[in-house]
């Protein structure tokens, strides 16, 4: 039970508007705010920012 509370599953949605999504886990203690990562978007075939969606 404790594992799910500390490291919840989050969706990372592309800011380019393609609708592409990554699914990952995050540590709430280290990252209490929303995550922003620069990852590869295969629809655009380039790296763009992905923001956490709740």
Curated annotation (Swiss-Prot):
A Gene Ontology BP annotation from the UniProt entry: translation
GO molecular function, one term: structural constituent of ribosome
Sorted UniProt keywords: Ribonucleoprotein, Ribosomal protein
Keyword Ribosomal protein recorded: yes
Gene3D superfamilies according to UniProt: Ribosomal protein L33 (2.20.28.120)
Classification via InterPro entries: Ribosomal_bL33 (IPR001705), Ribosomal_bL33_CS (IPR018264), Ribosomal_bL33_sf (IPR038584), Ribosomal_zn-bd (IPR011332)
Gene Ontology annotations for the cellular component aspect, listed alphabetically: cytosolic large ribosomal subunit
One Pfam family from the record: Ribosomal_L33
Protein origin, superkingdom: Bacteria
Entry-linked PANTHER family: 54S RIBOSOMAL PROTEIN L39, MITOCHONDRIAL, LARGE RIBOSOMAL SUBUNIT PROTEIN BL33M
Family: Belongs to the bacterial ribosomal protein bL33 family.
Protein's name in the database: Large ribosomal subunit protein bL33B
Originating species: Mycolicibacterium smegmatis (strain ATCC 700084 / mc(2)155) (Mycobacterium smegmatis)
This protein's encoding gene: rpmG2
């Amino acid at each position: 039970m404790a594992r799910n509370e500390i490291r919840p599953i989050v969706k990372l949605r592309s800011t380019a508007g393609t609708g592409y999504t990554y699914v990952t886990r995050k540590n709430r203690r280290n990252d209490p705010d929303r995550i922003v990562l620069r990852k590869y978007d295969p629809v655009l075939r380039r790296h763009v920012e992905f923001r956490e969606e709740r």
